[in-house]
Curated annotation (Swiss-Prot):
The gene is puhA. The modification N-formylmethionine is found at M1. It comes from Blastochloris viridis (Rhodopseudomonas viridis). GO terms for biological process: photosynthesis, light reaction. GO terms for cellular component: plasma membrane light-harvesting complex; plasma membrane-derived chromatophore membrane. Gene3D superfamilies: Photosynthetic Reaction Center, subunit H, domain 2, Photosynthetic reaction centre, H subunit, N-terminal domain. The reaction center is a membrane-bound complex that mediates the initial photochemical event in the electron transfer process of photosynthesis. This is Reaction center protein H chain. Heterotrimer composed of subunits L, M, and H.
C-alpha cells in the first residue's frame, strides 16, 4: 500500500471527500427541513396543544421568524407566533389524542376537513404590472374564448343530484397564465352569483356538469367582496367548498366503500 492509504482501495483523501459531502448535504437538509416549517406551523393538536419557539431562543423544529417584503407592498413575517383563532367545529370520536375528528355541523359551511382553507391575505392577487390577476371576461375585454372551443355562457349547470343549479353568465380568466380559472354562475331561484373552479367542471356542448356538490348547496358557495375581483383567501375558500363536497355533499360519500 502507498503512503496515506488505509486499505488497498481506500485512503484518507477519499474519506475526507466523502465526509465533506456528508456534512454539506446534512446541513442543507436540516436547513431546508426547518425553513419549510414557515407555513403550516406551529402545529396545533386537536386538544389545543401549540408548539411555539421560545422568545429568547430556538427549538430545532421551528426557524426564527423571518420578514419577507412583498412585491406590491407590505411585509409578512413567518412563522407567526399567534395561534389559530378560528373555532374548529370538530369533535374527536374518542377520548385519546390522535382520535379521528368528526364534523359537528355543516362541514362545507364550517370549512373543516377537505373543505378547510388557509387564512391567506384578503388582498387581490396581482400581475407583474399591478393589475388584478383573476377577473371576469367583462373586465378583461382583451381576452376571448379560443375559436372552436365551447362557449359555456348561457349553458345550464347540472349538479350531482341531476338538478339544474343555474346558468353560466361569465368566465374568469387568469391574466398572467392566460387560463380560465372559474365559471360564474347565476344561482337558480336566487339573485346571487357563485364561482365554480374550472377543475370541478365537466364542460359539455349543451351543459356543465358539476358532481362535487348538490344543486341546493350552490346557495352556500362563499361570496366575494367584489363583483369583479377575488382575493387570495376567497380563492382558497371557493375551491375548498367544492373540494369538501367530494366527501361531504352527501352522507354516503363520507362512508367507507366496503
Amino acid at each position: 500500500m502507498y503512503h496515506g492509504a488505509l486499505a488497498q482501495h481506500l485512503d484518507i483523501a477519499q474519506l475526507v471527500w466523502y465526509a465533506q459531502w456528508l456534512v454539506i448535504w446534512t446541513v442543507v437538509l436540516l436547513y431546508l427541513r426547518r425553513e419549510d416549517r414557515r407555513e403550516g406551523y406551529p402545529l396545533v393538536e386537536p386538544l389545543g396543544l401549540v408548539k411555539l419557539a421560545p422568545e429568547d431562543g430556538q427549538v430545532y423544529e421551528l426557524p426564527y421568524p423571518k420578514t419577507f417584503v412583498l412585491p406590491h407592498g407590505g411585509t409578512v413575517t413567518v412563522p407567526r407566533r399567534r395561534p389559530e383563532t378560528r373555532e374548529l367545529k370538530l369533535a374527536q370520536t374518542d377520548g385519546f389524542e390522535g382520535a379521528p375528528l368528526q364534523p359537528t355541523g355543516n362541514p362545507l359551511v364550517d370549512a373543516v376537513g377537505p373543505a378547510s382553507y388557509a387564512e391567506r391575505a384578503e388582498v387581490v392577487d396581482a400581475t407583474v404590472d399591478g393589475k388584478a390577476k383573476i377577473v371576469p371576461l367583462r373586465v378583461a375585454t382583451d381576452f376571448s374564448i379560443a375559436e372552436g372551443d365551447v362557449d359555456p355562457r348561457g349553458l345550464p349547470v347540472v349538479a350531482a343530484d341531476g338538478v339544474e343549479a343555474g346558468t353560466v353568465t361569465d368566465l374568469w380568466v387568469d391574466r398572467s397564465e392566460h387560463y380560465f380559472r372559474y365559471l360564474e354562475l347565476s344561482v337558480a331561484g336566487s339573485a346571487r352569483t357563485a364561482l365554480i373552479p374550472l377543475g370541478f367542471c365537466d364542460v359539455k356542448k349543451d351543459k356543465i356538469v358539476v358532481t362535487s356538490i348538490l344543486s341546493e348547496q350552490f346557495a352556500n358557495v362563499p361570496r366575494l367582496q367584489s363583483r369583479d375581483q377575488i382575493t387570495l383567501r376567497e380563492e382558497d375558500k371557493v375551491s375548498a367548498y367544492y373540494a369538501g363536497g367530494l366527501l361531504y355533499a352527501t352522507p354516503e360519500r363520507a362512508e367507507s366503500l366496503l
